[in-house]
Amino acid sequence: MKLSKLLQLAVFSSLVTSKNIFDLESLKQGLQDEETVNNDKREPVNLLYLDRFKMGVSDEAKGNAKFKRDPKNVIDPASLKEGSAEEEQKDKREPKNLFNLQALHEGLKDEETKSKREAKNLPNLEALEEALKGGSLPKKDAKNLIDLVALKQSLEKEAAKRDAKNIPDLEALKTGIEEEEGQVAKRDAKNVINLSNFIETPSKREGKNLFDLTKFQQSGQPIKKRDQKILKQEKSLFVLNSVDCFNNLLQSILPQLSSISIFSSYIRQFASIDARTANPQKVMLIVAPDNDSLETKLSDLKPWEFPEQITPEQSEQEQDKTLKNNLLHFLNGHLINNFEENLVIDKSSTDAVTIISKLNNGKFLKIKQDQLSQKFSIRLLDSENWIDVETIKQVENGFVLIINDSLVKP
């Protein structure tokens, strides 16, 4: 009996005796009986018999009934060596795209033995030279060239043609003018200036805007402060251009002169001096250094920095007073109050008109005007160097002389 039937009987017997209780004793007996019975066991599935596998391998190793299969993807060095030997015995194929230098060399030798063909489009210089020497080379007619001989002949033929119209005959015109000059008297020209009248030297007219200094001429005695006398003389001295004369006051003209803007600002800092420039009743002379001279000709100092120097011991008020006194000292060395009342004429110079006047700082100033060039120059009486006056301006109450220098220096 099969094990399944025994299990069914055991279950059934257990159910009869008791419910839900297994009879382990009967189950054990049934299993023992099952082992004694020759029942055909079913063959197991998915089992690997190693003995069979071992026997197959041994048989294959012995080479009794089976042959080894050839290995794949394995290099056989012996066959490779034999193949190389066989390859060496075969004829090598000819390479492609390679020059056969030997054949090329032989071809060049054969080419040298053959006669060379004549080159095309190349000049034969030897034949050309022989043709030029022999003079046998025919000349061809030039193109696009003017035939001067033919042109000359055509012009000569053209001259024989009829007279041209609307063309003046200059030769006939010249002849007619010459005949007319011999027969007819010339009429007076209109609107023509007679230059000969200007070549003559007429008497000079009296100049305008002249500063009459005749009443200030000295009596010929040496110049001394106490003995100065002003005499009249019917003659005008300095001559000025009308473009340098203005019908306004010094206070108005000074701001218009940009070249002396710095010096003009110094004048405006002192109310008393600025008031004199606005007084039309008093004549004042101003010798004004230009801006360039104030920056370059004072030894890198400012006009308020000399002659007195500021010390650290001074108070702020004392320093301001020193600066103000220095600047006033600089201005007084360039100003002349009541100019008409403080000048004399110097007769020692014959080629120029020269006058002498006293500056506000007590020094004497010479002013001269060259009679030929009409240019002005000035110098201090204790100096030998003349300073050219760059520009001079005259107004109702004084003069402004602009110089590129300074009369007061450190």
Swiss-Prot record:
Keywords: Signal, Vacuole. Residues 247-407 form the FAS1 domain. GO terms for cellular component: vacuole. Coiled coil: none annotated. Residues 64-73, 83-96 have a biased composition (Basic and acidic residues). InterPro entries: Mug57-like. Residues 64-98 are annotated as: Disordered. Residues 1-18 form the signal peptide. It comes from the Eukaryota. This is FAS1 domain-containing protein CaO19.3004. The lineage of its organism: Eukaryota, Fungi, Dikarya, Ascomycota, Saccharomycotina.
